[in-house]
Design a protein with these regions (language model features):
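Catalytic cores of alpha/beta
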Residues: 78-93, 137-149, 184, 188, ...
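Active-site-adjacent beta->alpha loops and helix N-cap segments on the catalytic face
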Residues: 28-29, 50-69, 80-87, 105-123, ...
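Residue-level detector of anion-binding/catalytic polar loops
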Residues: 47-48, 67, 99-100, 131, ...
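Conserved N-terminal beta1-alpha1 strand-loop-helix module at the mouth
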Residues: 1-95, 126-132, 140-147
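Alpha/beta catalytic cores of nucleotide-metabolism and tRNA/nucleoside-modifying enzymes
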Residues: 1-3, 21-23, 172-233
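Glycine-rich phosphate-binding active-site loops on the catalytic face of alpha/beta enzymes
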Residues: 19-21, 43, 72-77, 96-110, ...
Length: 233
């Protein structure tokens, strides 16, 4: 797909995050589960998929004809960065054909000392035709990432960094601020649990939105039900 085709495909739509980490119930060594989630999402009208690991991305692209936002989650000593942290992971994601490559775009440094903006600039220099999304937490980091060449900025890390501790719900004001001030296209992601919140995120100015836990993580979904029930006993 061309960049314009990808933009037209995902604009105003739902991108479903299909991920299972090793400690989660839907994880298997062989894979095969996340492609089924992606098929269900596609059948339900999703406009794209967000996926983690080359294995899952490759399997998903074999069964759905939707743009894929690809990441590789990996912990590194000495840094809180864990979403597509090094150029090695970038190389792997580009090689497997991700449509949009997502990286963590917060204020911490990568293991080699690079800022998020420096890392994105290096990606764009190496892969000038690759669409890049920065998973951000605040306006300063989003603007820096967009200035470095990020095509999309996501609200993915809002509430998950020391600078944004205590934000445990969708920050519609932040989405609106990004839409006003940031030149990159805004992807609302994180803390979106209901269709009503999804619609409100689009009204706030999001170009598109990503939902994962409320759709593809049954343990989280069930936990919300049981917590609500137990609170009313």
């Amino acid at each position: 797909m061309t960049h314009e085709q990808i933009f037209n495909q995902i604009k105003g739509g739902l991108i479903v995050s299909c991920q299972a980490l090793e400690h989660e119930p839907l994880y298997t060594k062989e894979g095969g589960v996340m492609p089924l989630m992606a098929k269900a999402a596609a059948q339900s009208g999703a406009v794209g998929i967000r996926a983690n690991t080359v294995r899952d991305i490759t399997q998903i692209k074999q069964v759905v004809d939707l743009p894929v936002i690809g990441i590789i989650k990996k912990d590194y000593p000495g840094t809180p960065m864990y979403i597509t942290v090094t150029m090695q992971e970038v190389d792997e994601l580009v090689a497997c054909g991700v449509d949009i490559l997502a990286v963590q775009g917060t204020g911490a440094l990568r293991p080699n000392g690079q800022t998020s903006a420096e890392f994105i600039r290096a990606i764009k220099e190496k892969y000038p035709d690759q669409l890049v999304m920065a998973d951000c937490d605040n306006i300063e980091n989003a603007l820096a990432c967009a200035g470095a060449g990020a095509d999309f900025v996501g609200t993915t890390m809002r509430g998950y960094t020391p600078e944004t501790t205590g934000i445990n719900d969708v920050d519609f004001g932040f989405i609106a601020q990004l839409a006003r001030e940031c030149p990159a296209k805004v992807i609302a992601e994180g803390h979106i649990h209901t269709p009503e919140q999804a619609v409100q995120a689009l009204y706030a100015g999001a170009f598109a939105l990503v939902v994962g836990g409320a759709i593809t993580r049954p343990a989280e979904i069930a936990a919300r039900y049981t917590a609500a029930i137990n609170n009313h006993k």
